[in-house]
Amino acid sequence: MSNLFQAFPGKTVEERKAIAKKFYRNFTDNFIEVIKLISASGSFVEKHFTGDFSIPNKVYDEGKRCQLMLSHNFNWEMACLGIPINSKHLFLIVYMPIGSKVIDRLFMKIRTRTGGALVPATDMRTGMLPYRNNLTMLGLVADQNPGHPKNAYWFNFFGKLTPFVKGAESGARRGNTPVIFCKFIKQKRGYYKIIFELGEQNPATTQPTDITKKYVEYLTTFIKEYPEMWLWSHRRWKWDWKPEYGEILN
């Protein structure tokens, strides 16, 4: 895989092949697990997706909303079901509508089976209105490609200049909403553990790009430790940097 060569030029061919083999196994498992989630009970999800929720629950106890910055980390679909079961917050899942209406409805059904709610990325302001009086945890897949490379923060990410969306940080700073990072660790086949880390308690006191920089560093560390757990096959590097897109931030 060309992405692995770019990200890990210091690894041998055999080492990259080993990562690719584990990645494809996880990719296949992810597909099978999504099918299972169509009918899985809450007790099944609770058994297969675990973690210490004390960090987000403390934010809830303080009477605050929070923002969760995730990544394309297996198995994010199980997280959509596991987080609402364990979190005191109402979990709002920001999602990109799928072109096929049939598939879109299927994934909407899966992702909301345990109490989470969906907010379309195409109209977040309207989508969040029904929940304005709730203490919510807003889940954002923050390593998503931006809609346009000009509207992004650019970082050197695994040997390639890479754009990151601005919205996750700007929304948190505007509302002074505590930011939490998280990752999913595969304990064994079909079993995952979520690990939280407080990214920023008071975003309004930070400078623009500070939170995104922390997130990029967090994501980089995670991928280096668990390279087989990240979705290498998605087109993360489809944009090439140009001077008019702005400065490189690391």
Model-derived segments and their meaning:
Residues S2, L81, K109, S170, ...:
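Surface-exposed charge patches
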Residues M1-L70, D104-K109, G115:
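Membrane-anchoring hydrophobic helices of lipid-metabolizing enzymes
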Residues E62-T122, G147-K160:
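Catalytic core of membrane glycerolipid acyltransferases/transacylases, capturing the structured
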Residues E14-K21, K58-D61, I85-N86, T122-N250:
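Non-catalytic C-terminal accessory region of glycerolipid acyltransferases
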Residues I19-A20, G42-E46, S71-F74, L90-I93, ...:
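Short acidic/polar alpha-helix capping motifs at helix-coil junctions
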Residues V34, S41, E46-K47, N73, ...:
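Generic secondary-structure boundary/loop-capping signal
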